[in-house]
């Protein structure tokens, strides 16, 4: 198996033991100096893992694009800019209602918002990082992202926040619909998941309207500030989502 043709390409590897590895490949010729493994053959490294040629059952180059600009009927779904941090803090971070059902606020201060946005921007080199600002006629109305990509199940989780001033206009459904389509059809991710508290009717309605299906309910599965909610799990699998 000629591994050097995959050097510095994004690949998915299935080894002979059934393990899956996915990421940017760096290849090494036989005899490169990996004698610590006592194996003189070609190898490939993905993150901290070395896989030798004879252990590879299947290797495939995959095309991923990461966070690209999308458009829907009313929204521009774009990459973050550092200038967004202050607007996100003012629109989301200062509004306790935004985190009523999560208890987690990464924008609680201007400094936290700036650091979070900076981390998002720094992550754009990762082809499986997906983070967007939602813009309506030049005005920031919310954020959406997908995270925790799992190559074993070819799945990812999606989350969205709309600034309260813009609730009730269908923007969450519109953004979700565009992102779900992009992730399954363009990125070929088979399963996109999401979760919310049972009392979070707005999120539930947006996910259902975007085509996500309720697949599981965990009784008492979410506790926020001493309040216990059932946790609802949703999933979307686009027609083009399954990988070969």
Report residues per predicted region:
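Short loop/turn microsegments at loop-to-beta-strand junctions
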Residues: 9, 89, 129-130
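Conserved RNA-binding domains used in RNP assembly and mRNA/RNA metabolism
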Residues: 1-64
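Conserved GNAT-fold acetyl-CoA-binding loop/helix
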Residues: 97-119
